[in-house]
């Protein structure tokens, strides 16, 4: 009756495939001497001391085991009258078929097990366009970046260590990343010690990757072990270089609850866990082979205190002292300054296997990074103002796999079944990814960006010859008519707590303008008085201004990051899929629901000061021309002068 139900399900469901992060093991069991296939032989797979799945061969000695979580397994074949053979370390990759034949020898040392070490084939029969890297291979590589591991595959280009990859000429964003079947948004966030394998597909993409235009990088995390084990890793370069690379990693795995065997001993694990994590602190994440040039500390301190010098022609104003530095004022340093990165990521998984046909996995990853980002523009004079960025990603998932068919079926019944390897998988996941980009000192206090102090402008009326008409009386006045307002004094009250380096430009400019008795644009005397904002000539800085660059090559000292931004991306996914084998044909079906939510907020706060200067008093810039105010003396005699009040708009 059960088989009839399976048949109906298989016929009703169409082959619309949803993603399943599992692999398949196929092969033939045969006699070592004669080469004849062995029907009804038992084949099982084990990992970490747990028997995870098994089957029997058909009349042709063929077997198929699926679904199998990607990883390394021991494959064991047994049959009455033959020596047991076990192949260790067989690699099962996601969405691929691994072919493994076994040959049994009849009647030789039946009590012994022949153990053979698996050898990775040079050519993968089910994936000629890609490659799989195992945990052992990943650890042996001189990198901890998933993209860098993937770049060792033919057809993949990577510009530099840790950068995104280009697959067969496609753009970087055409590469899709998956972790345990979850499409990645944000950081991958899996510690190296928690990676079971990385599978790269560069061509011939399966149907479930319908939205991938470049290639696929699929990461499978490690699962629990039947025995407790743990590891600790510590790395540091602080004694040998200035990059100060420091890393601490750990991994823990083991059973929480085990089955009881008939004899009372503990059997395979029912509930198991795996937990891994890494913390990394490094001062320079991308060192230069030739070092970096920077201005010397004592020279920088002098520039901050004395940013200007008088021009040879004093009437030309001032020149920036940064433009007169020589080679002796610079030094080459091994590591970039103020580019520290702190990163923490942890990955965990709980596996439940109450029966041989039911499997539930719950897990997640957490990734957090805070860094000061390198800027070539600020590297020479103002690396202290490098941007601060942060990223936080967490990912949760749950997956249920239910196989059909009893493990207690007879060999004949199992091998002759029309429908085999029937199962369904239900998976749900949620991802949250957040970014921030700010100035480290001001963050979201927007009005502190570029603030150097308080400026006050003093004005007086400006007159010119002409006529004025009183609209209410029709009287026409001739004489000196009020035509506008002119600046008479421009003062600066320095802020001594925020952006001191920027404020020093303005303080020094006001002081030198007075010391050298320069003339204002709106003055006639060389009295050293600044009367209008135009007198600053782009050297004395107003709120929101940045200093002039050094030969258009580097930002001058005090150049700060002008940005404050937040970004959040979320993803919720639900998938269900099923599969069954009818003879040598596989029928698969499923669906996938994915919902994304993207939000971003950001601005260049220093630009607000320019807008505020344009908008301040905008409503009283005009004169009330309809209501002139003629000036009369005490005797009522017109003084040939007409004033206007401001017109409020």
Predicted regions and their residues:
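Membrane-embedded beta-strand positions in outer-membrane beta-barrel channels/transporters
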Residues: 62, 99, 164, 202, ...
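Transmembrane beta-barrel strands of outer-membrane/channel proteins
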Residues: 117, 232-236, 275-281, 362-366, ...
């Amino acid at each position: 009756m059960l088989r009839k139900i399976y048949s109906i399900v298989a016929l009703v469901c169409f082959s619309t495939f949803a993603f399943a992060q599992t692999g398949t093991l196929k092969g033939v069991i045969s006699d070592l001497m004669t080469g004849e296939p062995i029907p009804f032989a038992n084949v099982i797979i084990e990992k970490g001391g747990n028997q995870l799945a098994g089957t029997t061969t058909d009349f042709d000695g063929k077997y198929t085991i699926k679904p199998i979580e990607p990883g390394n397994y021991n494959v064991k074949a047994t049959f009455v009258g033959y020596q047991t053979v076990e192949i260790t370390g067989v690699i099962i990759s996601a969405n691929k078929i691994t072919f493994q034949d076994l040959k049994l020898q009849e009647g030789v040392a039946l009590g012994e097990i022949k153990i053979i070490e698996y050898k990775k084939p040079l050519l993968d029969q089910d994936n000629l366009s890609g490659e799989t890297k195992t945990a052992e291979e990943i650890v042996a590589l001189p990198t901890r970046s998933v993209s860098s591991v993937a770049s060792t595959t033919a057809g993949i280009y990577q510009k530099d260590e840790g950068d995104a990859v280009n697959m067969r000429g496609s753009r970087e964003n055409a590469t899709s990343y998956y972790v345990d079947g979850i499409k990645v948004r944000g950081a991958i966030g899996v510690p190296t010690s928690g990676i079971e394998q990385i599978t790269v597909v560069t061509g011939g993409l399966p149907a479930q990757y319908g939205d991938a235009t470049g290639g696929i990088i699929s990461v499978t995390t490690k699962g629990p072990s039947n025995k407790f084990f743990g590891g600790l890793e510590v790395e540091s370069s602080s004694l040998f270089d200035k990059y100060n690379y420091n890393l601490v990693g750990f991994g823990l795995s083991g059973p929480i609850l085990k089955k009881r065997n008939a004899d009372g001993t503990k059997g395979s694990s029912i509930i198991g866990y795996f937990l891994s994590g890494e913390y990394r602190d490094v001062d320079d994440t991308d060192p230069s082979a030739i070092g970096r040039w920077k201005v010397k500390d004592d020279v920088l301190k002098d520039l901050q205190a004395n940013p200007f010098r008088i021009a040879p022609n004093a009437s030309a104003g001032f020149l920036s002292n940064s433009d007169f530095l020589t080679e002796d004022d610079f030094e080459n340093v091994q590591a970039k300054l103020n580019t520290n990165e702190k990163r923490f990521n942890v990955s965990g998984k709980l596996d439940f296997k109450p029966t041989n046909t039911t499997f539930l996995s719950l897990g997640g990853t957490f990734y957090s990074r805070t860094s000061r980002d390198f800027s070539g523009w600020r590297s020479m004079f103002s690396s202290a103002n490098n941007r601060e960025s942060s990223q936080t990603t967490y990912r949760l998932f749950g997956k249920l796999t239910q196989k059909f068919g009893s493990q207690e079926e007879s060999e004949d019944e199992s091998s002759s079944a029309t429908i085999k390897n029937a199962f369904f998988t239900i998976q749900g996941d949620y991802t949250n990814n957040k970014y921030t980009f700010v100035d480290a000192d001001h963050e979201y206090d927007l009005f502190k960006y570029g603030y150097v102090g308080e400026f006050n402008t003093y004005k007086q009326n400006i007159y010119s010859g002409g006529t004025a008409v009183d609209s209410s009386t029709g009287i026409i006045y001739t004489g000196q008519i009020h035509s506008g307002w002119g600046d008479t004094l421009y003062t600066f009250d320095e802020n001594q707590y925020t952006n001191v380096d920027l404020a020093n430009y303005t303080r020094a400019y006001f002081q030198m303008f007075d010391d050298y008795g320069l003339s204002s644009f709106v003055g006639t005397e060389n009295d050293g008085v600044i009367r209008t904002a135009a007198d600053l000539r782009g050297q004395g800085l107003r709120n929101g201004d940045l200093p002039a660059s050094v030969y258009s090559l580097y930002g001058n000292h005090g150049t700060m990051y002008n940005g404050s931004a937040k970004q959040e991306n979320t993803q919720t996914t639900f998938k269900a899929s099923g599969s069954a084998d009818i003879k040598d044909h596989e029928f698969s079906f499923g669906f996938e629901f994915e919902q994304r939510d993207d939000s971003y907020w950001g601005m260049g706060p220093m630009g607000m000061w320019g807008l505020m200067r344009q908008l301040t008093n905008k409503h009283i810039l005009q004169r009330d021309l309809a209501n002139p105010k003629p000036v009369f003396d005490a005797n009522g005699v017109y003084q040939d002068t007409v004033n206007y009040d401001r017109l409020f708009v």
